[in-house]
């Protein structure tokens, strides 16, 4: 494996980037951030330099161990395989499948439908309504699932990849003014997780590229 700090290409508000920041913090991995502003200058993800890292023109991208990995779940799977302690995935195969199911529900079934590229397509005047619709649809399903899987967190009482995906998506829901009162399980788990240091240090309000007016 290559020596030197991993480098994370991240945007402070990107929920996918936040997932990876949480995972890196959880595993105690020291890393450097290279901010990629998805809005400034038409989007820095479209530069030729960044496209050599990720032809999909998306964040996050992680340089680690001599390779570059994109897609947040793939990054977390790699971290789990190479640095397994503390765990993001339970040892029990059934619990592990449930964690992956919840993670994929959020990462494939909710977030992509309300990401920046989709919102641009629906038009400025329709963005809030569209985001609320798709997040609500996903949360209706997620709440039912979590009612049967949750302990203190999404799957039992240990933080997992599912939790790493949940918190950034709840932040998206809040940003789009989704009514969270129908989702008490989601809301309770989110509150418990936000009390943990790894979720705080990785928070969008505490990143190098966070605008001054949004910092806490």
UniProtKB/Swiss-Prot annotation:
GO terms for biological process: L-phenylalanine catabolic process; tyrosine catabolic process. Expressed in liver, kidney, seminal glands and breast. Glutathione binds at residues 14-19, 45, 59, 71-72, 111, 115-117. InterPro entries: Glutathione-S-Trfase_C-like, Glutathione-S-Trfase_C_sf, Glutathione_S-Trfase, Glutathione_S-Trfase_N, GST_C, GST_Zeta, GST_Zeta_C, GST_Zeta_N. PROSITE patterns: GST_CTER, GST_NTER. The modification Phosphoserine is found at residues 137, 181. Its cofactor is glutathione. Residues 4-87 form the GST N-terminal domain. It comes from the Eukaryota. Residues 92-212 form the GST C-terminal domain. Homodimer. This is Maleylacetoacetate isomerase. The gene is Gstz1.
